[in-house]
Amino acid sequence: MKLKINSQGLKGHLKVPGDKSISHRSIMFGSIAKGKTIIHDILRGEDVLSTIEAFRALGVEIEDDGQVITVHGQGISKLKEPEKALDMGNSGTSTRLLSGILAGLPFETTLFGDDSLSKRPMDRVATPLQMMGAEIVGQTDKVKLPMTIKGSAHLKAIDYVLPVASAQVKSAVIFAALQAEGLTKVVEKEKTRSHTEEMLVQFGGEIKVSDKTSLVPGGQKLMGQEVTVPGDISSAAFWLVAGLVVENSELILENVGINETRTGILEVIQAMGGQLEILEQDEVAKAATLKVKASQLKGTEISGDLIPRLIDELPIIALLATQAEGKTIIRDAAELKVKETDRIAVVADALNSMGANIEPTDDGMIIQGGTKLHAPENAINTLGDHRIGMMVAIAALLVENGEIELERAEAIQTSYPSFFDDLEKLSENL
């Protein structure tokens, strides 16, 4: 598709789609809890639909009336062996978290996905689940999809130190621990997003969290709840950056989730001198209205324990850095290589083709800022990565003339089906 270029500014209010991480987990907890779970403002993107279809295949009744989703949970022990292999689409979250649930169920399930998901390593989740007693077989020593899980009704609790900072692996172990005999201990090296722990408590479960250590007793019973999903800060990130770098822009984003394990991008914007206001903060819902204006920005360093708090936002942060004066260094982010694409290489290639000056490194990027972007000579392919597609669409707004062709733009449906509609709306408000 041809992208809109040469924006004269973006103006207006926007409510971004529901948080993808919370949407996945609300379906999962609703499916393993007993009783009715009602979910408001869920993200209806392709990844979350993969989770919904997987639990329907496991025997859970899930209704969608277009307004709310209702999950009729009967408890985890009532999940049934699916009649065929489960299609995870492009969703790493669906695959890894569901693996933790399947690990404790006494039947065999095969999971498969698209080409991108089939390249992603699942050994990181298979290893602790095998230690607990599940049998898991996948492709190559990295346990890639298709992967078959033979669960055990007698999982054993473990003490496990996560080798990588991964909320998905942590969550898989927590889901398995709910079904295990004994007390499971999970230790993180870097703190990652905490939605699983918080939602477990919301559904009546027990977990003790102290800094980077979580203790989960086994044999827990959960009860259905009512959940309202806040806006996704990872989706809001594209508009935050657009509002900062496109001249004559001023944007207000309503009801954005600001869980402290996800707000790294807000700290980066402030460190770079961006005009950002946090308004109407709801401490209970962990949501706020965010306002940004076009700003003069300066380079910064992004590393260490900040990385897990903005890992999904790093592609659009790279674009932000191209428009800041001076150098921005991103390090400790090797995890980017095993996302939907190798995001270090793909981000650098895409933005460099538009005139940016980005040097990819083993664990991040060195970005020389203050560069003027131009139309690339060739089309840019998302390679099936939704965040690459949206990053390029925002970058295109900075290009004064020429044409930018985005191939496989449909990947954006994964997390933000209304992205181009929202872009049009904000462009028309001038």
Swiss-Prot record:
Pathway: Metabolic intermediate biosynthesis; chorismate biosynthesis; chorismate from D-erythrose 4-phosphate and phosphoenolpyruvate: step 6/7. One of its GO terms (molecular function) is 3-phosphoshikimate 1-carboxyvinyltransferase activity. 3-phosphoshikimate binds at K20, S21, R25, S166, Q168, D312, K339. The active site is at D312 (proton acceptor). It is found in: Cytoplasm. It is an enzyme of class 2 (transferase). Pfam families: EPSP_synthase. InterPro entries: Enolpyruvate_Tfrase_dom, Enolpyruvate_Tfrase_sf, EPSP_synthase, EPSP_synthase_CS, RNA3'P_cycl/enolpyr_Trfase_a/b. One of its GO terms (cellular component) is cytoplasm. Keywords: Amino-acid biosynthesis, Aromatic amino acid biosynthesis, Cytoplasm, Transferase. PROSITE patterns: EPSP_SYNTHASE_1, EPSP_SYNTHASE_2. It catalyses: 3-phosphoshikimate + phosphoenolpyruvate = 5-O-(1-carboxyvinyl)-3-phosphoshikimate + phosphate. GO terms for biological process: amino acid biosynthetic process; aromatic amino acid family biosynthetic process; chorismate biosynthetic process. Gene3D superfamilies: Enolpyruvate transferase domain. It comes from the Bacteria. Its main location: cytoplasm. Phosphoenolpyruvate binds at K20, G92, R120, Q168, R343, R387. Its EC number is 2.5.1.19. Monomer. NCBIfam families: aroA. Catalyzes the transfer of the enolpyruvyl moiety of phosphoenolpyruvate (PEP) to the 5-hydroxyl of shikimate-3-phosphate (S3P) to produce enolpyruvyl shikimate-3-phosphate and inorganic phosphate. Belongs to the EPSP synthase family. HAMAP family: EPSP_synth. This is 3-phosphoshikimate 1-carboxyvinyltransferase. The lineage of its organism: Bacteria, Bacillati, Bacillota, Bacilli, Lactobacillales.
